Amino acid sequence: ILTSEALQEKKIAELAEQIASKKDVKMVLIAGPSSSSKTTFAKKLGLQLRIKGLKPVTIGTDDYFVERSLTPRDENGEYDFETIDALDLDLFNDHLTRLINGETVNIPTFDFKEGTKRYDDNKKLHLNDDEILVIEGIHCLNDKLTSKIPKENKFKIYISDLTVLNIDNFNRISTTDTRLVRRIVRDYNFRGYSAKETLDRWPSVNRGER
Protein backbone atom coordinates (compact mmCIF):
# COMPACT_ATOMS: atom_id res chain seq x y z
CA ILE A 1 0.00 0.00 0.00
CA LEU A 2 2.77 2.43 0.91
CA THR A 3 4.56 1.68 -2.36
CA SER A 4 1.38 2.31 -4.36
CA GLU A 5 0.78 5.60 -2.55
CA ALA A 6 4.38 6.67 -3.19
CA LEU A 7 4.04 5.88 -6.90
CA GLN A 8 0.82 7.88 -7.06
CA GLU A 9 2.46 10.88 -5.37
CA LYS A 10 5.32 10.64 -7.87
CA LYS A 11 2.90 10.70 -10.81
CA ILE A 12 0.99 13.63 -9.32
CA ALA A 13 4.26 15.52 -8.83
CA GLU A 14 5.11 14.89 -12.50
CA LEU A 15 1.72 16.30 -13.53
CA ALA A 16 2.31 19.39 -11.39
CA GLU A 17 5.69 19.84 -13.10
CA GLN A 18 4.02 19.69 -16.53
CA ILE A 19 1.37 22.20 -15.50
CA ALA A 20 3.89 24.63 -14.02
CA SER A 21 6.00 24.49 -17.19
CA LYS A 22 3.07 25.60 -19.38
CA LYS A 23 2.84 29.31 -18.71
CA ASP A 24 -0.43 29.75 -20.65
CA VAL A 25 -2.34 27.23 -18.50
CA LYS A 26 -4.87 29.02 -16.29
CA MET A 27 -6.97 26.06 -15.18
CA VAL A 28 -6.67 22.34 -14.50
CA LEU A 29 -9.74 20.24 -15.35
CA ILE A 30 -10.03 16.89 -13.53
CA ALA A 31 -12.54 14.39 -14.94
CA GLY A 32 -13.55 10.91 -13.83
CA PRO A 33 -16.58 8.76 -12.96
CA SER A 34 -18.83 9.69 -10.06
CA SER A 35 -17.23 9.08 -6.64
CA SER A 36 -13.84 8.18 -8.13
CA SER A 37 -11.82 10.31 -5.67
CA LYS A 38 -11.60 13.39 -7.93
CA THR A 39 -11.77 15.72 -4.94
CA THR A 40 -9.06 13.81 -3.07
CA PHE A 41 -6.88 13.81 -6.19
CA ALA A 42 -7.45 17.55 -6.63
CA LYS A 43 -6.24 18.20 -3.07
CA LYS A 44 -3.09 16.11 -3.63
CA LEU A 45 -2.41 17.87 -6.93
CA GLY A 46 -2.96 21.21 -5.23
CA LEU A 47 -0.23 20.42 -2.71
CA GLN A 48 2.22 19.55 -5.50
CA LEU A 49 1.30 22.73 -7.37
CA ARG A 50 2.13 24.75 -4.27
CA ILE A 51 5.58 23.16 -4.25
CA LYS A 52 5.98 24.53 -7.80
CA GLY A 53 4.97 28.01 -6.68
CA LEU A 54 1.34 27.90 -7.86
CA LYS A 55 -1.58 28.43 -5.49
CA PRO A 56 -4.62 26.29 -6.43
CA VAL A 57 -8.08 27.85 -6.36
CA THR A 58 -10.91 25.32 -6.48
CA ILE A 59 -14.23 25.78 -8.27
CA GLY A 60 -16.89 23.07 -8.20
CA THR A 61 -19.08 22.41 -11.23
CA ASP A 62 -21.76 21.25 -8.77
CA ASP A 63 -22.38 24.89 -7.87
CA TYR A 64 -23.35 25.68 -11.47
CA PHE A 65 -26.47 23.58 -11.91
CA VAL A 66 -29.38 25.31 -13.62
CA GLU A 67 -32.43 26.11 -11.52
CA ARG A 68 -34.49 23.01 -10.70
CA SER A 69 -37.33 24.13 -12.97
CA LEU A 70 -34.89 24.20 -15.92
CA THR A 71 -33.25 20.84 -15.19
CA PRO A 72 -33.61 18.36 -18.10
CA ARG A 73 -35.60 15.19 -17.52
CA ASP A 74 -34.79 11.65 -18.61
CA GLU A 75 -37.01 9.21 -20.52
CA ASN A 76 -38.86 8.38 -17.28
CA GLY A 77 -39.66 12.00 -16.53
CA GLU A 78 -37.13 12.17 -13.67
CA TYR A 79 -34.65 15.02 -13.29
CA ASP A 80 -31.39 14.18 -15.06
CA PHE A 81 -28.65 15.85 -13.02
CA GLU A 82 -25.87 13.93 -14.78
CA THR A 83 -26.25 15.36 -18.27
CA ILE A 84 -23.98 18.28 -19.08
CA ASP A 85 -27.10 20.25 -20.02
CA ALA A 86 -28.05 20.28 -16.33
CA LEU A 87 -25.23 22.80 -15.86
CA ASP A 88 -25.52 26.55 -16.45
CA LEU A 89 -22.82 26.53 -19.13
CA ASP A 90 -23.22 30.18 -20.12
CA LEU A 91 -22.70 31.38 -16.55
CA PHE A 92 -19.85 28.93 -15.96
CA ASN A 93 -17.96 30.03 -19.08
CA ASP A 94 -18.63 33.69 -18.32
CA HIS A 95 -17.17 33.34 -14.83
CA LEU A 96 -14.12 31.41 -16.06
CA THR A 97 -13.44 33.96 -18.80
CA ARG A 98 -13.69 36.86 -16.38
CA LEU A 99 -11.45 35.15 -13.83
CA ILE A 100 -8.61 34.43 -16.26
CA ASN A 101 -8.93 38.03 -17.48
CA GLY A 102 -8.25 39.32 -13.98
CA GLU A 103 -11.81 40.26 -13.00
CA THR A 104 -13.57 39.55 -9.70
CA VAL A 105 -16.47 37.09 -9.78
CA ASN A 106 -19.16 36.22 -7.23
CA ILE A 107 -19.17 32.41 -7.22
CA PRO A 108 -22.57 30.78 -6.53
CA THR A 109 -23.33 28.01 -4.07
CA PHE A 110 -25.99 25.58 -5.26
CA ASP A 111 -28.67 24.64 -2.73
CA PHE A 112 -29.58 21.06 -3.65
CA LYS A 113 -32.60 20.93 -1.36
CA GLU A 114 -34.16 24.08 -2.82
CA GLY A 115 -32.78 23.58 -6.34
CA THR A 116 -31.42 27.09 -6.74
CA LYS A 117 -28.14 29.05 -6.70
CA ARG A 118 -27.35 31.29 -3.76
CA TYR A 119 -24.83 34.12 -3.70
CA ASP A 120 -22.73 35.31 -0.78
CA ASP A 121 -20.60 38.45 -0.88
CA ASN A 122 -17.95 36.52 1.05
CA LYS A 123 -17.55 34.13 -1.89
CA LYS A 124 -16.13 36.63 -4.36
CA LEU A 125 -13.10 35.35 -6.23
CA HIS A 126 -10.17 37.02 -7.96
CA LEU A 127 -7.15 35.22 -9.43
CA ASN A 128 -3.68 36.55 -8.72
CA ASP A 129 -0.76 35.89 -11.06
CA ASP A 130 0.49 32.98 -8.95
CA GLU A 131 -2.93 31.30 -8.69
CA ILE A 132 -4.43 28.60 -10.92
CA LEU A 133 -7.98 27.26 -11.11
CA VAL A 134 -8.56 23.59 -10.25
CA ILE A 135 -11.94 22.29 -11.45
CA GLU A 136 -13.26 18.75 -11.08
CA GLY A 137 -16.35 17.02 -12.41
CA ILE A 138 -17.52 14.15 -14.61
CA HIS A 139 -17.79 16.46 -17.64
CA CYS A 140 -14.38 18.14 -17.40
CA LEU A 141 -13.07 16.44 -20.56
CA ASN A 142 -16.11 17.61 -22.52
CA ASP A 143 -15.17 20.67 -24.59
CA LYS A 144 -18.75 21.90 -24.21
CA LEU A 145 -18.10 22.58 -20.52
CA THR A 146 -15.41 25.17 -21.26
CA SER A 147 -16.27 26.08 -24.85
CA LYS A 148 -15.36 29.76 -24.41
CA ILE A 149 -11.91 29.08 -22.94
CA PRO A 150 -8.90 28.89 -25.32
CA LYS A 151 -7.34 25.42 -25.54
CA GLU A 152 -3.92 26.66 -24.44
CA ASN A 153 -5.41 27.87 -21.14
CA LYS A 154 -6.59 24.38 -20.16
CA PHE A 155 -4.83 21.28 -18.79
CA LYS A 156 -7.06 18.20 -18.66
CA ILE A 157 -6.63 15.11 -16.47
CA TYR A 158 -8.72 11.92 -16.31
CA ILE A 159 -8.67 9.68 -13.25
CA SER A 160 -10.55 6.53 -12.26
CA ASP A 161 -10.73 4.66 -8.97
CA LEU A 162 -9.54 1.08 -9.64
CA THR A 163 -9.27 -0.08 -6.03
CA VAL A 164 -10.34 -3.74 -5.79
CA LEU A 165 -11.86 -5.16 -2.60
CA ASN A 166 -12.02 -8.94 -2.27
CA ILE A 167 -14.79 -10.84 -0.49
CA ASP A 168 -12.59 -13.96 -0.53
CA ASN A 169 -9.95 -15.54 -2.76
CA PHE A 170 -12.40 -16.00 -5.61
CA ASN A 171 -14.90 -13.14 -5.41
CA ARG A 172 -14.36 -9.42 -5.52
CA ILE A 173 -16.45 -6.28 -5.09
CA SER A 174 -16.50 -4.32 -8.33
CA THR A 175 -15.15 -0.78 -8.40
CA THR A 176 -18.57 0.37 -9.63
CA ASP A 177 -20.21 -0.98 -6.47
CA THR A 178 -17.56 0.72 -4.35
CA ARG A 179 -18.24 4.03 -6.07
CA LEU A 180 -21.98 3.56 -5.52
CA VAL A 181 -21.47 3.18 -1.77
CA ARG A 182 -19.30 6.32 -1.73
CA ARG A 183 -21.98 8.17 -3.71
CA ILE A 184 -24.73 7.11 -1.28
CA VAL A 185 -22.74 8.44 1.68
CA ARG A 186 -21.84 11.71 -0.09
CA ASP A 187 -25.38 12.39 -1.31
CA TYR A 188 -26.79 11.79 2.17
CA ASN A 189 -24.24 14.02 3.92
CA PHE A 190 -24.00 16.88 1.44
CA ARG A 191 -27.05 16.84 -0.84
CA GLY A 192 -29.85 15.75 1.43
CA TYR A 193 -30.72 12.66 -0.64
CA SER A 194 -31.73 9.32 0.86
CA ALA A 195 -30.01 6.07 -0.14
CA LYS A 196 -33.10 5.13 -2.16
CA GLU A 197 -32.98 8.42 -4.08
CA THR A 198 -29.32 7.83 -4.95
CA LEU A 199 -30.04 4.25 -6.04
CA ASP A 200 -32.91 5.47 -8.21
CA ARG A 201 -30.58 8.01 -9.86
CA TRP A 202 -27.66 5.60 -10.35
CA PRO A 203 -28.65 4.50 -13.91
CA SER A 204 -28.73 8.19 -14.88
CA VAL A 205 -25.30 8.67 -13.30
CA ASN A 206 -23.90 5.82 -15.39
CA ARG A 207 -25.32 7.34 -18.57
CA GLY A 208 -23.79 10.71 -17.74
CA GLU A 209 -20.36 9.12 -17.32
CA ARG A 210 -20.30 7.62 -20.81
Question: Residue spans of the language-model regions?
Answer:
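Hydrophobic positions on the alpha1 helix immediately C-terminal to the Walker A/P-loop
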Residues: 40-41, 45, 60
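Conserved glycine(s) of the Walker
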Residues: 37
